[in-house]
Every structure is written in structure tokens, then in C-alpha cells.
UniProtKB/Swiss-Prot annotation:
Natural source organism: Acidithiobacillus ferrooxidans (strain ATCC 23270 / DSM 14882 / CIP 104768 / NCIMB 8455)
Entry-linked SUPFAM superfamilies: Nucleic acid-binding proteins
PROSITE patterns: RIBOSOMAL_S17
Keywords: Ribonucleoprotein, Ribosomal protein, RNA-binding, rRNA-binding
Designated name of the protein: Small ribosomal subunit protein uS17
Amino acid sequence: MTEAKNPRSLVGTVVSNLMDKSIVVNVERRIQHPLYKKYIRRSKKFHAHDAENICHIGDIVKIEECRPLSKTKSWRLVSVLAEGVIEGDNA
């Protein structure tokens, strides 16, 4: 068995971290409408493995494709690029 040579990687925003060692990442992309040529935002949610539970809601993260870890998880957390701001925290 060999590892994937170039696994796909995506950058997105953490929208849920309620599960143990799992996060949900929302990835946005822009596509051009085939007829009207207007750019439209499309988004998709990916379940990713967060082994150390370090992510918080609002964080910008990089995820990478891996072998299936569960029924819905086949991505893993690579790094946290930027930490999200917690609203209502005026300390």
C-alpha cells in the first residue's frame, strides 16, 4: 500500500466543534455562471479529524484528504491558519 502522492487540501472555516476529535469545516469557492458569466459563491461542509481538539468555531484551517476514518470523515486537520474571534468576549 502506498500513500497518496499529492492529497487534496482545502482551506475553510470551522463551523462546528461539538464532536470529540471532529470538526465541520465550511469551504467556499467561486464559480462562474456558464451563461451569465457572473461569479457565484458555492459552499460545502466537510467533516475532518481533529486529533487534539485544538480548533474552535470561526478558526480558519487547512484540511487534507486521507483514508476514510468513519462514515463521514475522510479529511484531517493539517494546521490552524488563523484563530477566530469569539463574539461577546469583551475582556
